[in-house]
Regions:
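Large, well-folded core regions of big proteins
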Residues: 1-196
Length: 196
């Protein structure tokens, strides 16, 4: 993590938290607090005037992917018991109103999911209804490419679907088990995982 841009800070934080959790599961203590706390402080101070993040410092050039990555890292830190003083007050997402002006992107799913985890006010149901057909359209394009070229391995957008299904299940109390079932696989030890 040579450059200490926001992406590298968040990635380092995730790595340190995962290492700490792993060592604790083995019953060993590890001293990473001195490394974790300054990263949390730095990331929270790098929040820009839009209450999100860019690649460097607190630049106004907001990156939604970057913001989602940082929000996930800070949520992991908070869940691990670290104080995270994050200013999301007044951040309200009006995705249905802004989408016509900027189009739809896959990173929208990641930022909506991250904001949902932080309980930011938004009409998540409408956003999911807009994004699910978008993902299906991308899948159809991939299938079309696969039909034309037998060596082409199409993307299934499983990650994006799982994020949308999680929001849908929590916000609309919709059972998404039937949607997930085709992706469930078992390993040699009967452990369950998702794969496309």
């Amino acid at each position: 993590y040579k450059y200490l841009c926001n992406e590298q800070l968040a990635s380092k934080l995730i790595g340190l938290l995962a290492y700490q959790q792993y060592m604790q599961s083995k019953g060993e203590k590890v001293k990473v607090d001195k490394a974790i706390r300054p990263i949390i402080h730095r990331l929270t101070n790098h929040q820009n005037k839009h209450q999100l993040w860019s690649w460097w410092g607190n630049s106004e050039n907001t990156s939604f992917w970057m913001s989602a990555h940082i929000l996930r890292a800070l949520k992991m830190a908070q869940d691990a018991g670290y104080p995270v003083e994050l200013n999301l007050n007044g951040l309200k997402v009006e995705y249905a109103h802004t989408r016509p002006y900027r189009g739809m992107k896959l990173e929208d799913i990641e930022i909506l999911h991250a904001l949902h985890e932080w309980k930011v006010e938004a009409d998540y149901s409408s956003a999911v209804r807009l994004l699910e057909p978008f993902v299906r359209q991308l899948e159809q394009k991939e299938d079309s490419l696969a039909n034309r070229n037998k060596y082409y391995r199409p993307l299934s957008y499983l990650k994006e679907k799982l994020l949308l299904w999680e929001i849908k299940q929590q916000v609309d109390s919709v059972n998404v088990g039937d949607s997930v079932r085709p992706y469930l696989k078992k390993d040699m030890l009967e452990g369950v995982y998702c794969d496309d």
